[in-house]
Structure formats: C-alpha cells, structure tokens
Amino acid sequence: GGITYATDVETPQGVVVETGRPIECLRTLLSSGRYTVGHIVCFRDSAYARSVPETALVREDGQLWYDAEGQAWLDPTDPQVLQYITALVKECGELGFKEVLLDQFCYPADTTGVANTAADPAQVLADFAENLRSALPEGTALSVVVRSTDSLSVEQMAELFDRLYVPAEGDLAAVKAALPEGYDPETRVVAMTAEAPQSGSYVIVS
C-alpha cells in the first residue's frame, strides 16, 4: 500500500508515496555498482483496494473481501491493477535495479467467500508474469516470493522466474525438492532470513 520513493507512476489516493526520497537519489544509488533488488508487493494491497474498490476481490454482496489478517486483495484479472503493477515493474527496471522481486504474486491461500476468483488462477498469473518480463530491460532478473503454491506450483514458478525467494515461515526443503531438473537451488533459490545460514543464497530481512 506504499511506495518508498518518489515514483513517476500514477497512484490512486490512499497509496502513500514517500516523496522525501527523490527519484534522482535512487538513481545515484542504483548506479553505484551494487546488486540491487526492487521489491514489489503485488495483489495484497489494502490501500489500493480501499481507494479503488472496483479493482479488488469482493464478496457476493459486492463489498471488499478481507483475508484472516484483515488485508484486502486486488483482482489479478483487473486491467487497471495489471497496468499499475506493470508500470512499477517497468520503472524499477528502467531505474537500474538488477532484479525485480514480486511478493504476494498469488491469489489468497484461502479464497472462501470471494465472489470474483478466476476460473484458472494459474493461467492468469502465468500470463501476467510473462507480460511483466517483456516489460523489463534485457538482463534484468524477475523473481518471486513463494508465499503460496495454491495458485502456481513451485515447478511453474521455476519456469517463469529467475529466482525463488522462500520466506522464513516457508518450507525451504519442500521448495527445493519440487524444483524441475536443471534449476540450480544453490544460486536460484534464496532463503529470506533474519540471520545468515551456513551455505546457499539468502537475503537478510529485518
């Protein structure tokens, strides 16, 4: 529901944009030679859903649907939602991020009570992932956080994305076991953790 830099992408009222971080300062950081990852939370976005409720997952009565933690979700089939996320992904690539990491790139794990779920959620997400890749400059990696395998399987995600990030509460061993042949878990599966493991790829989350 918030953007941590002064984006040029048009955002609806209610989505907080930190204008105190000018985009030129971000460009300076991105040109420093460091390996940078742009983190974009996609469909679990209460601020956007409340601001533009017609783009969200809803109940049978047309009111916003909320998950067990009280968060609203955007509809992955809504054109305005797809255009918004695509614009953010494209901007991150053009700014110079080496990698764009998609989070909550899924339907809710439990969609009980949702009136407007897609007939084939996996196809909806796979098609969108391919469109996002085409929006990025050549050489920019596109990765995903494995939050749920109900919409896309690990094997499908491995085919669509350069790296799979597994949160601390996730099952890292199960993700690695489900990888297709040829997908190197040492370089393409990243553990999200509070402290560094003894081996493998990881990212520190504080």
Positions of the model-derived regions?
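Active-site-adjacent "subsite" loops/lids of carbohydrate-active enzymes
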Residues: 43-90
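Substrate-binding cleft of carbohydrate-active enzyme catalytic domains
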Residues: 25-43, 89
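Aromatic-lined carbohydrate-binding/catalytic grooves of carbohydrate-active enzymes
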Residues: 1-20
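Aromatic-lined carbohydrate-recognition surfaces of secreted/lumenal glycan-active proteins
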Residues: 35-45, 101-103, 121-155, 165-168, ...
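Conserved beta-strand positions
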Residues: 102, 110, 166-169, 203-205
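C-terminal active-site rim and adjoining tail of enzyme catalytic domains
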Residues: 175-206
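Active-site groove signature of glycoside hydrolases
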Residues: 1, 74-114
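Glycine-rich tight-turn/loop motif centered on a GG-T
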Residues: 11-15, 112-123
